[in-house]
UniProtKB/Swiss-Prot annotation:
Entry's EC annotation: 2.2.1.7
Binding sites annotated in the UniProt record for thiamine diphosphate: 77, 118-120, 151-152, 179, 290, 372
Gene3D superfamilies per the UniProt record, alphabetical: 3.40.50.920, 3.40.50.970
Organism: Leptospira borgpetersenii serovar Hardjo-bovis (strain JB197)
GO BP annotations, alphabetical order: 1-deoxy-D-xylulose 5-phosphate biosynthetic process; isopentenyl diphosphate biosynthetic process, methylerythritol 4-phosphate pathway; terpenoid biosynthetic process; thiamine biosynthetic process
Function: Catalyzes the acyloin condensation reaction between C atoms 2 and 3 of pyruvate and glyceraldehyde 3-phosphate to yield 1-deoxy-D-xylulose-5-phosphate (DXP).
Protein's UniProt name: 1-deoxy-D-xylulose-5-phosphate synthase
Subunit structure comment from the entry: Homodimer.
Binding of Mg(2+), residues: 150, 179
Reactions that this protein is recorded to catalyse: D-glyceraldehyde 3-phosphate + pyruvate + H(+) = 1-deoxy-D-xylulose 5-phosphate + CO2
The gene coding this protein: dxs
Similarity section: Belongs to the transketolase family. DXPS subfamily.
Length: 635
């Protein structure tokens, strides 16, 4: 029996959507939502946030002439409905997979994706830039819409952009998708009535006529205009929560139900005609339409494949623990013994493994929101108050606070403990989340010490050792990976000597200098080279600063060639720093650095990406063997 055709089957692009009668849009939304649930239950991906914006996405593409009209998504992990409606429906099953769809908007994928996104707070700046460019270009006429969440709109960048937009008074729309931290409650039917009035063409037209008339009145005109504007604003402020946005120069509408697609279409059609910057405040629900995700949107923010009937996900290998979970557990142990310890995170309690720590020591955890610049300066100041701050942050987000790293920590030599998660290749989140820059800038900072654990016990030992280290700021950086729990001892005495490294094997033909997370691939390369008859030294560089230069040069004096293996960009990692210190005595011995080339590193599983860039053990061994043979170094 042939399956009955659905409305979604008829929609490949927004032009097809606009041919659907308005009254059938709720059915379209239902089908889009079911398609997301059906697909992601099999492949995983960002889930709850996408279920929460189905009606909004359908309404936007129904009202606006995309891609001529610009839709700009903040962060972008909520764009699966957008991808479904813009020609990528059949590829959603490949999302976040190697050579598949990105989990975020991506310019190379579609003309409907204006910007590659992944970090928060950028959309309003981009929307304002689009509006300014439009108005400087003769003959251009298109709408610009930024869609931003309630967490992102509190970022400094978003507020800076709103301040500028209020000054420029460009025609643009900001849609506030409020799905977690409600700014204010809807006051009911009066608010709805007012919103209907202020979005009407009639109201806005005669308001402009009225104020123009007042300006022409001699003597009393300007004063009367100011008076009536204050009355209008005051009446609106009493009944609706938009005072802050009005003060920034935005016309405010809301809060509105973000799941009433027909009302949204009618509202957006009116807002589209309004002049100046407009903010439309929508209340939505993460996980909308799927009970488990509605009950626990944090758990279902990002999912692995799950059982559609009840949302059950594989609990994973219980014999392993994530590096980030080690952080939370170890900080709990340390704080129990030392009340001066504090943990700081920019809106990443779950991701940074701090959930249990937050429950156990709520007064010692400071979640500063999406405010990386503030978080670093805040941590630096805590050291001045004799507190021991552990700044827990993803590598990709620390780049947002480089100025504070320089000015507010390293130049003053303040002993902040930086715990840098997701360093190196992070896999499915793709180019905007890869942690490939941190070693380049950390090693260029005055006073900053850098430790790169190569296993879980190193991680534990460094967290404990850092507690009493107050001579300088220090950073430890570690991958998004799991380690065997049974190999870990959270209470052992620490023997961590700065400037040391481990010599795991000694040979005479070649030395592999492995940095942190690349140790496993370096071990595989060593085994392959030794099986081919080469004599190999394998060095595990766990301390980059301070670096044991004399001891390292001593080891290199016993080999004929050496290579560096670093899970960073070749030109922005540790190799330049290392070579400046060891090349003077080993110039003729250097072969190459294995790392990523200076290009965006796309999404996929870490193993797939490592292999694609020939950074796996087998590829390293093959490349090195070829070089050795060309240099007449034979096994």
């Amino acid at each position: 029996m042939q399956q009955e055709s659905t409305l979604l089957d008829k929609i490949d692009y927004p032009a097809d959507l606009r041919n659907i009668p308005l009254e059938k849009l709720p059915q379209v939304c239902k089908e889009v939502r079911n398609y997301i649930i059906d697909t992601l239950s099999g492949v995983g991906g960002h889930f709850a946030s996408n279920l929460g914006v189905v009606e909004l996405t359908v309404a936007l593409h129904y009202v606006f002439d995309t891609p001529k009209d610009r839709l700009i998504w903040d962060v972008g992990h909520q764009t699966y409905p957008h991808k479904i409606l813009t020609g990528r429906k059949d590829r959603l099953k490949t999302v976040r997979k190697f050579n598949g769809l990105s989990g975020f908007p991506k310019r190379e994928e579609s003309p409907y994706d204006l910007y590659n996104t992944g970090h928060a707070g950028t959309s309003i700046s981009q929307a304002l830039g689009e509006a300014a460019a439009r108005d400087l270009t003769k003959g251009e006429d298109y709408s610009v819409v930024a869609i931003i969440g309630d967490a992102s709109i509190a970022t400094g960048m978003a507020l800076e952009a709103m301040n500028h937009a209020g000054h420029l008074k460009k025609d643009m729309i900001v849609i506030l998708n409020d799905n977690y931290m409600s700014i204010s409650k809807n006051v009911g039917s009066i608010s709805n009535y007012l919103n209907n009035i202020i979005t009407s063409h009639f109201y806005n037209h005669w308001k402009r006529v009225f104020y123009t008339f007042l300006k022409w009145l001699p003597i009393v005109g300007p004063a009367a205009e100011r008076f009536f504007k204050k009355v209008e604003k005051g009446f609106k402020d009493v009944l609706t929560p938009g005072g802050l946005f009005e003060d920034l120069g935005f016309g405010y509408i809301g809060p509105e139900d973000g799941h009433d697609v027909i009302r949204l279409v009618n509202m957006l059609a009116k807002v589209k005609k309004m002049k100046g910057p407009i903010l439309l405040h929508l209340i939505t629900q993460k996980g909308k339409g799927y009970d488990p995700a509605e009950r626990d949107p944090i758990k279902y923010h990002g999912v692995t494949p799950f059982r559609k009937e009840d949302g059950a996900m594989d609990s994973g290998d219980t014999s392993k623990i994530a590096y980030s979970k080690i952080v939370g557990r170890m900080l709990s142990i340390l704080t129990e013994a030392n009340p001066k310890i504090a943990a700081i995170t920019p809106a990443m309690i779950e991701g940074s493994g701090l959930k249990e720590y937050a429950e156990k020591y709520p007064d010692h955890l400071f979640d500063v929101g999406i405010a990386e610049q503030h978080s670093v300066a805040f941590a630096g100041a805590m050291t001045n108050g004799s507190i021991i701050p552990y700044m827990c942050i993803y590598s990709t987000f620390l780049t947002r606070a480089i100025d504070q790293l320089v000015q507010d920590v390293s130049l003053m030599n303040l002993p902040v403990r930086f715990v840098i998660d997701r360093a190196g290749c992070v896999g499915p989140d793709g180019e905007t989340h890869q942690g490939l820059f941190d070693l380049g800038y950390l090693l260029g900072l005055p006073n900053m010490d850098v430790f790169v654990p190569s296993n879980g016990q190193d991680m534990i030992d460094s967290l404990r050792w850092m507690e009493t280290y107050d001579k300088a700021p220090i950073a430890i950086r570690f991958p998004k990976a799991n380690v065997d729990l049974k190999t870990l001892d959270f209470y052992k005495e620490v023997d961590l000597r700065p400037g040391t490294f481990r010599v795991l094997k000694r040979g005479t033909d070649l030395a592999l200098l492995s940095i942190g997370s690349m140790i496993d691939e370096a071990k595989k390369a060593t085994e392959i080279l030794e099986s081919a008859g080469f004599s190999v030294t394998l060095i595990d560089l766990i301390w980059l600063r301070p670096l044991g230069v004399e001891a390292l040069n001593e080891e290199l004096s016993n080999v004929r060639r050496f290579v560096i293996i670093d899970e960073s960009y070749v030109d922005a990692g540790a190799s330049g720093y290392l070579l400046n210190r060891i090349l003077p005595e080993n110039l003729s011995k250097y072969v190459k650095t294995f790392g990523f080339p200076p290009e965006p590193i796309h999404h996929g599983e870490r193993k797939e990406i490592i292999q694609a860039y020939r950074l796996d053990g087998a590829s390293i061994a093959e490349s090195v063997a070829d070089v050795l043979k060309k240099n007449l170094i034979k096994p």
